[in-house]
Amino acid sequence: MKITIGHLYPDLLNLYGDRGNIQCLMRRCQWRGIEAETIPFELDDKIDFSKLDIVLLGGGSDREQMIVCEKLQKIQPDFKAYVEDNGVVIAICGGYQLLGKYYKTDQGNMKGLDLVDLYTEQGEGRLIQNIVLQSELFDMPIVGFENHGGRTCINNNKPLGKVLYGAGNDGKSGYEGVVYKNVIGTYLHGPLLPKNPQLADWLIQHALERKLSLIH
């Protein structure tokens, strides 16, 4: 059984070392004898979500996010169907913001992909610091570095974790990230997965479980 990881637009969404997250997933599969491959998608490439087991959506500048969002809007129904069918997604920083309904900035509103019921609005100043979370998903805390101007509201969705140290989604709710089905969105960098191998293993496990369920 092979795990196929789709890395969406690494040439544009490459602000925070997301290739380190890909390398972590590949290595942890290798250590367990799980065959894995990564497919990097450029802007003009066709994406067939039915052939992907894990999707990584990284972070970029507002300009690059807008370029990517306009492209993904054209295949939003396919991406939405993948998410609703328990497809595994890890979305970081700008990618996290793209999951939602919109991102409101001083320059105007950027329509999101509406994959998860959340939205982001630009706040005053940036939230920049180390951050520690306690998550119901893991015994070990989740650690990383946050650097974002957006304030994200996840409505009634489940957060990735409770903030023990740092700001989190909006600097006031006390929570960070979102978990919806097999989608995780977060502002944490580090890179995220090498710092939190338990999270990498969660993604791999859920990808394998989904693949097995589709076979049967």
Label the predicted regions.
Residues H7, T38-P40, L115, G144-E146, ...:
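Conserved beta-strand scaffold positions in the cores of enzyme catalytic domains, especially
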Residues D106-E176:
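Pocket-forming structural segment of enzyme catalytic cores
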Residues Y9, I92-G94, V116, H148, ...:
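A secondary-structure boundary/capping signal
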